[in-house]
Amino acid sequence: MAQGSGGREGALRTPAGGWHSPPSPDMQELLRSVERDLSIDPRQLAPAPGGTHVVALVPARWLASLRDRRLPLGPCPRAEGLGEAEVRTLLQRSVQRLPAGWTRVEVHGLRKRRLSYPLGGGLPFEDGSCGPETLTRFMQEVAAQNYRNLWRHAYHTYGQPYSHSPAPSAVPALDSVRQALQRVYGCSFLPVGETTQCPSYAREGPCPPRGSPACPSLLRAEALLESPEMLYVVHPYVQFSLHDVVTFSPAKLTNSQAKVLFILFRVLRAMDACHRQGLACGALSLYHIAVDEKLCSELRLDLSAYERPEEDENEEAPVARDEAGIVSQEEQGGQPGQPTGQEELRSLVLDWVHGRISNFHYLMQLNRLAGRRQGDPNYHPVLPWVVDFTTPHGRFRDLRKSKFRLNKGDKQLDFTYEMTRQAFVAGGAGGGEPPHVPHHISDVLSDITYYVYKARRTPRSVLCGHVRAQWEPHEYPASMERMQNWTPDECIPEFYTDPSIFRSIHPDMPDLDVPAWCSSSQEFVAAHRALLESREVSRDLHHWIDLTFGYKLQGKEAVKEKNVCLHLVDAHTHLASYGVVQLFDQPHPQRLAGAPALAPEPPLIPKLLVQTIQETTGREDFTENPGQLPNGVGRPVLEATPCEASWTRDRPVAGEDDLEQATEALDSISLAGKAGDQLGSSSQASPGLLSFSVASASRPGRRNKAAGADPGEGEEGRILLPEGFNPMQALEELEKTGNFLAKGLGGLLEVPEQPRVQPAVPLQCLLHRDMQALGVLLAEMVFATRVRTLQPDAPLWVRFQAVRGLCTRHPKEVPVSLQPVLDTLLQMSGPEVPMGAERGKLDQLFEYRPVSQGLPPPCPSQLLSPFSSVVPFPPYFPALHRFILLYQARRVEDEAQGRELVFALWQQLGAVLKDITPEGLEILLPFVLSLMSEEHTAVYTAWYLFEPVAKALGPKNANKYLLKPLIGAYESPCQLHGRFYLYTDCFVAQLMVRLGLQAFLTHLLPHVLQVLAGAEASQEESKDLAGAAEEEESGLPGAGPGSCAFGEEIPMDGEPPASSGLGLPDYTSGVSFHDQADLPETEDFQAGLYVTESPQPQEAEAVSLGRLSDKSSTSETSLGEERAPDEGGAPVDKSSLRSGDSSQDLKQSEGSEEEEEEEDSCVVLEEEEGEQEEVTGASELTLSDTVLSMETVVAGGSGGDGEEEEEALPEQSEGKEQKILLDTACKMVRWLSAKLGPTVASRHVARNLLRLLTSCYVGPTRQQFTVSSGESPPLSAGNIYQKRPVLGDIVSGPVLSCLLHIARLYGEPVLTYQYLPYISYLVAPGSASGPSRLNSRKEAGLLAAVTLTQKIIVYLSDTTLMDILPRISHEVLLPVLSFLTSLVTGFPSGAQARTILCVKTISLIALICLRIGQEMVQQHLSEPVATFFQVFSQLHELRQQDLKLDPAGRGEGQLPQVVFSDGQQRPVDPALLDELQKVFTLEMAYTIYVPFSCLLGDIIRKIIPNHELVGELAALYLESISPSSRNPASVEPTMPGTGPEWDPHGGGCPQDDGHSGTFGSVLVGNRIQIPNDSRPENPGPLGPISGVGGGGLGSGSDDNALKQELPRSVHGLSGNWLAYWQYEIGVSQQDAHFHFHQIRLQSFPGHSGAVKCVAPLSSEDFFLSGSKDRTVRLWPLYNYGDGTSETAPRLVYTQHRKSVFFVGQLEAPQHVVSCDGAVHVWDPFTGKTLRTVEPLDSRVPLTAVAVMPAPHTSITMASSDSTLRFVDCRKPGLQHEFRLGGGLNPGLVRALAISPSGRSVVAGFSSGFMVLLDTRTGLVLRGWPAHEGDILQIKAVEGSVLVSSSSDHSLTVWKELEQKPTHHYKSASDPIHTFDLYGSEVVTGTVSNKIGVCSLLEPPSQATTKLSSENFRGTLTSLALLPTKRHLLLGSDNGVIRLLA
């Protein structure tokens, strides 16, 4: 390049910056052809990185017409709306989001003229070979092939030279390729280009329809096109290739050989399909294998390998060099693509080290090798900043530190690293995925930085899309100084080459300022480039290379240099096409800038040093012309010139540091100019100074301060070397360079000469080359990090030589599974074949031997055969492959197709899971997850596939991977059809078993219950369920144990946010669902509180909740004190809950249930509540029950109304589907409530239902009155009290039905101790002074509270109602009325919500009045009633003061105070008057006055001061609708009948009948009239209530009853159960401690001998016990009676012959394992024995047994000869056996424990010795003397923790591989012979009947309780804990088991 600045500028003006290499001639030709033949705008085309094809940006419609084979193909439309820069960005690989309607395709081209050679050999395979392969056939084919190959080999060697037979027929390669492509891709070529009449079309006629491609593992072709000169294959764009996986996401394949083999399996399938059709795949590389997130690989053929190079093109033009041997810039720029053969990295490194190429050129080549792409915003080439612009004259930047480190400072990087390290450790300990990985640097050059750098040249739209959405041109750095200061990232090449980057294209953004020491951008670029080439930089550049591309990116060096990059250490498994790439793993050699270290002349002695420096100081001045700056590229000015002395040491001797630093950079520029002139003189002046100043160990270019001292002052005799001189340096550098070249770059490549000429190319030769390319590709995958330094377009033979060398040098790095296949494909064991570049492009690398190890040369079908041992493909691969192909083949448009697909997959899943390993599950799982998260398949996938997949995964992984998609399936409202499957009790039982009870209750149950609140519930409302828990937990104080008060159970379980711990991090990163679902879930939970996102702006719930705790807590305790004495004595408690024959009923119902269970194929033991059905004769719940139970109690209408409403139902619900869905869900909730028992049902089911009830009323739509066909509009004239349900009442029907069912099941305490306190919490005002502000959720809470109170009042007995009446008045009615009648509180939904609340409250108060009678109303309810009526007077007065009030109210900031006639002053919000007047109208006055005047009679005058005013208003209303009506106020209401009729305590009195509470039918005018036909004919003691059953709230008329009795249930709470339940619902779920109160709950007598072992089933509703009486019994854990009742076993297993000492459950298949010296496996549903394992020798019995955790199905048995044996239930015989003794005599194995992961087993011996064994390998990990006595029991806990107890009275906690115990507990009196674990606590039992609780984490401290003889008789023999229910099962030596809490 010319030296002048003009020439440089010319070169820099090229649009791409002038420094990156242009495309090769072949690529330019392909680009021109595609532009010409396909009419695609050249701006929409880009060469692919590998140089094999063109990427085109095309409209999707154009591509569709191409796919549909429409001819003629029109020109491709241009990207009109997009600028050139945007189009260029969209063509970059790392960009994934494209504008709508646009897509990218790959166009692969073949030049016809290069296919003119003959191609010999036909199809190598017969098509008939597609039947199932058998061993016989495989052997026959191998023998035939061997025979054929040996014959041919012999013929070629001995026969052919003498044979004169004609040459075998050969076809032109063009025809052969064209036909093979059509067969493989299943479509024919379309003519394109200038003449669409290609010769082949004349013959073939019109285009046939598209067929199917030969193999699904082959990348499909969108179209095959033919122009006169070219053949094109158009492929869909490949986003990620296998090269991206091994380069940027290597963790995707680590630790799993199955994944690598599966990719190979699919590639071989594709190659086999191509070879069968006679098509060679070409010189395959990692770039040719397309991979998606689920690791489904597709092969993309390398068609260019078919092209034979033309003769003239074969000769490469030699690179011109000038005399000094340096490649000049012009040649470098013009030489296409830097030809790989000549410029291999080795020579590149040497050229740079010796100064033959410039720094810039070398760094650009390193960028290219790392895959960095010009113009890619995410992966642009990166160069170092070399100058610090922040100082006035600039100074050199420290290249030993990364820019990130210089910018952020060491402190911040250390802080980042330490914080992420701590988070990583904490995350790892928690067992979930580590949230953070310790790192210092997040990115080297981010896309934001790239766009900011290029902001002046980038269109505004792009900047707004990437940098910041708002256009703020002045926010972008305005100068180089600010730019460099702002960014932690490195520089880009444009700042060294392109002056245009400084000039702005935006009118409102100024140009980028250059530093003050430059006058223009051209001058700056020239100076900047010169600085890059300066010797200061050259000498330190290798440090920067080590930091950016080299060994300092990983390991200890990276930590030391604070250079740990997140991308390299985060082990991410999502695919990426950019990242940080490490090229070198050895220290990079230093550039030998200046004179060599070993100079021809000796160095000067130190005495002269000071003198020389002082002499040279005066000789320096800055008189040079800065215009003569060399560009430092064209010649070796800076690198090889020995001029260092003239400036490096030109430094002030004193400490003038600032000046010294500030002038550094400028010095180097000015001095570089005269370097050439001083070449001779300066080196003669001080020859020795040069040689050691270069190698100075101090900061480059800076002299050591100590050099100023006189070194000659020391001892005379010692030889003093010059400062910084190292005589060994030259040798060390030589060693370093050699080491780097040998280890880092893989040694030398020899290129022997071997010319060859071959006429026709046999097809077999091409196919063999394919196999060799496959071998090279596999080796490149294995050695991915070592072959990064190969060029992407390196020829096959270069790649082969490289990988062959690597395989020889590093054989241990090749995985065992790939060693045989690499050896077969690359003939590693054979002699090394010398080969050269001139070997033809079409030749194979070497010839395979005709027979090798008995097999013919490798081909895909041979490698795929199950009978060939070359590749060890697991046996499940074919089934897995078929499963995936079926998944990919079906396109699902609707639900029917979705169901068909899932059903078909389900049929295949069994074959896949039969032999699958965990590695295989990793491949399968992403497909199942994406099915579970796609709309049309989610429900059916859950129904069909959840059970088998979760069974294979085990509970831990099922929670980790399947929980989130399950939540998605439950939350998706559009999935109505078939959704009821997910709510069947059978499916929910599977969920509980496979996820684990606790995980199901905590994470999934809230989402399951959501459906009850209506399918149309919005996402926000439904998510409130999860969040409300936290609000309530934070808003209310937890009541202490023992207090049974309103509100005590409100502290809800502190469930973690649904998203925490449920992320799906690992192999599922391909599933799109999770990426979307993560966002809202995580965002909604801020600081543990749920922030609602509703359409209207509203207060966060937490605001009012915080305030409401003060008031409610005081009332809670006071109520508890009053109520407590009643607990035992209330009549409901004992007498009514136990029917005499309930046990008889139970037996009958249990029998029928078991049949149902078997029909339902349920996997779980369950006990439906048949008992209640027997007792109460209830019917099933139907939807009509649920919907009609919504009406307000004081409602009615005639029977006709009810019928009309039933007819209107289908319109109200969403038809039959919705009805089935709600029916199924209600039935399931009823079943679940009984199954879970009272405490768990109250904590999890009831609490969630109560929260749901509020969401049923949220939003204005739910607050509309429902108008059925025959009904008048709201509050119409005439018949005032009608059925007035709002939509929310209909929606809340199923929720109320389920809530009342729980009350029926467990009795009245549920209403008074759980529901009423929750109601008082809902309605409590937010602060002590007056009502709080309402938000829409609080408003809905008020409506829900009043509705639920109404339901509860009906079911309360008279005594209970009277007991809690004061509380209802003060804690429910008055707070509701304070909101309703408030003059300052507005309702978010305005008058509508207030009107509904008003109507509901009237109904509620009227209901209570009817229940308690006039006297009690006067005594207890006068205040609420008076408050209600008072509001009319207040509004009346306000209306009169209206004029005076308004101006005052508007003027002040605070609310005006108004004095009312009662003398009180109240604040009034003038803005609310309108709302209040809309609600409290004349009509409302009439609505209130008439019923209360009837109900209260004369008392109304005593308790309602303003009754006359309200009466007048009511009269006005009557006049307005019918002027002739009488004034009701003037007429005394006449009471019907006599007093006793209103006596609430009467037996069968009228209020029990269906109509007495329904004013619509009873009010005639203003009289209450009881219709004759409504009286029951024979009302018994239960009256009409007997019809009300477990189904729902019965019929509509029952629903209007004033009082209904709760039916007696065998599960009703009384006695100890009631006391324990009251305590338990008040305890916070956050409490992780186990509290033992010795409350006796149930007894299980039946064993005739001592109970040896007890084991609860995982669902905690049944448990197993084994005894000395040789039986195993299965017991139900449902609550009965008051704590004194006894329960009979459900099943007795009697097949044992000796005493049973072990019983447990195999979780995966749900079988029971019990042992009496022989192991029995049996079915708990039927009691049938499935398998018996007898000891091999009766003299060596089994002494200990343990079952492996799910998903394993093995049993581990220890025999008395210290041998461990493993049995798999699915297979006959033993799996394997391991010896434990090992020469010692540790005694008998007493106890076995298996770690929760199943990876290790620990055995405890009678001698106190313990042995830890790896279950996978059988290796003994550790053996140690743990105790001094017999080991009694061992348990293994998560986190590799073991707990052991011994007869030496100790209990010890161990870490698996640590020598010392972490905790040691000593029991004083007796040894701990039995214990169980609760979280991080151990619950222990001793022979002296003491129960202790001690912690695994905290220092030893133990709380012990002695069991009282009243609660536990006999001696404690065994103990088991129910973790969810928090109960203890204690077995005794007298055969009785007791349940205590």
Curated annotation (Swiss-Prot):
<dbReference type="GO" id="GO:0006511">
    <property type="term" value="P:ubiquitin-dependent protein catabolic process"/>
</dbReference>
<feature type="repeat" description="WD 7">
    <location>
        <begin position="1902"/>
        <end position="1941"/>
    </location>
</feature>
<feature type="repeat" description="WD 1">
    <location>
        <begin position="1639"/>
        <end position="1677"/>
    </location>
</feature>
<feature type="region of interest" description="Disordered">
    <location>
        <begin position="1569"/>
        <end position="1602"/>
    </location>
</feature>
<keyword id="KW-0677">Repeat</keyword>
<feature type="region of interest" description="Disordered">
    <location>
        <begin position="618"/>
        <end position="637"/>
    </location>
</feature>
<dbReference type="GO" id="GO:0035014">
    <property type="term" value="F:phosphatidylinositol 3-kinase regulator activity"/>
</dbReference>
<dbReference type="GO" id="GO:0005829">
    <property type="term" value="C:cytosol"/>
</dbReference>
<dbReference type="GO" id="GO:0050821">
    <property type="term" value="P:protein stabilization"/>
</dbReference>
<dbReference type="InterPro" id="IPR036322">
    <property type="entry name" value="WD40_repeat_dom_sf"/>
</dbReference>
<keyword id="KW-0225">Disease variant</keyword>
<feature type="region of interest" description="Disordered">
    <location>
        <begin position="1022"/>
        <end position="1074"/>
    </location>
</feature>
<comment type="subunit">
    <text>Interacts with WDR91; involved in early to late endosome cargo transport. Interacts with BECN1; negatively regulates the PI3 kinase/PI3K activity associated with endosomal membranes. Interacts with SQSTM1; the interaction is direct and regulates the interaction of SQSTM1 with ubiquitinated proteins. Interacts with MAP1LC3C; recruits MAP1LC3C to ubiquitinated protein aggregates in the aggrephagy process.</text>
</comment>
<keyword id="KW-0991">Intellectual disability</keyword>
<keyword id="KW-0809">Transit peptide</keyword>
<feature type="repeat" description="WD 4">
    <location>
        <begin position="1777"/>
        <end position="1815"/>
    </location>
</feature>
<feature type="repeat" description="WD 5">
    <location>
        <begin position="1819"/>
        <end position="1856"/>
    </location>
</feature>
<dbReference type="GO" id="GO:0070530">
    <property type="term" value="F:K63-linked polyubiquitin modification-dependent protein binding"/>
</dbReference>
<dbReference type="GO" id="GO:0007005">
    <property type="term" value="P:mitochondrion organization"/>
</dbReference>
<feature type="region of interest" description="Necessary and sufficient for the interaction with SQSTM1">
    <location>
        <begin position="1"/>
        <end position="650"/>
    </location>
</feature>
<keyword id="KW-0963">Cytoplasm</keyword>
<dbReference type="InterPro" id="IPR001680">
    <property type="entry name" value="WD40_rpt"/>
</dbReference>
<dbReference type="Pfam" id="PF00400">
    <property type="entry name" value="WD40"/>
</dbReference>
<feature type="compositionally biased region" description="Polar residues">
    <location>
        <begin position="1137"/>
        <end position="1146"/>
    </location>
</feature>
<dbReference type="GO" id="GO:0005765">
    <property type="term" value="C:lysosomal membrane"/>
</dbReference>
<keyword id="KW-0472">Membrane</keyword>
<dbReference type="GO" id="GO:0031902">
    <property type="term" value="C:late endosome membrane"/>
</dbReference>
<feature type="region of interest" description="Disordered">
    <location>
        <begin position="1097"/>
        <end position="1217"/>
    </location>
</feature>
<comment type="function">
    <text>Functions as a negative regulator of the PI3 kinase/PI3K activity associated with endosomal membranes via BECN1, a core subunit of the PI3K complex. By modifying the phosphatidylinositol 3-phosphate/PtdInsP3 content of endosomal membranes may regulate endosome fusion, recycling, sorting and early to late endosome transport. It is for instance, required for the delivery of cargos like BST2/tetherin from early to late endosome and thereby participates indirectly to their degradation by the lysosome.</text>
</comment>
<dbReference type="GO" id="GO:0045022">
    <property type="term" value="P:early endosome to late endosome transport"/>
</dbReference>
<dbReference type="InterPro" id="IPR011009">
    <property type="entry name" value="Kinase-like_dom_sf"/>
</dbReference>
<feature type="region of interest" description="Disordered">
    <location>
        <begin position="694"/>
        <end position="718"/>
    </location>
</feature>
<comment type="similarity">
    <text>Belongs to the WD repeat WDR81 family.</text>
</comment>
<feature type="region of interest" description="Disordered">
    <location>
        <begin position="1"/>
        <end position="27"/>
    </location>
</feature>
<feature type="repeat" description="WD 3">
    <location>
        <begin position="1729"/>
        <end position="1769"/>
    </location>
</feature>
<dbReference type="GO" id="GO:0031901">
    <property type="term" value="C:early endosome membrane"/>
</dbReference>
<keyword id="KW-0853">WD repeat</keyword>
<feature type="region of interest" description="Disordered">
    <location>
        <begin position="1523"/>
        <end position="1556"/>
    </location>
</feature>
<protein>
    <recommendedName>
        <fullName>WD repeat-containing protein 81</fullName>
    </recommendedName>
</protein>
<feature type="compositionally biased region" description="Gly residues">
    <location>
        <begin position="1586"/>
        <end position="1595"/>
    </location>
</feature>
<dbReference type="InterPro" id="IPR052651">
    <property type="entry name" value="WDR81"/>
</dbReference>
<dbReference type="InterPro" id="IPR036372">
    <property type="entry name" value="BEACH_dom_sf"/>
</dbReference>
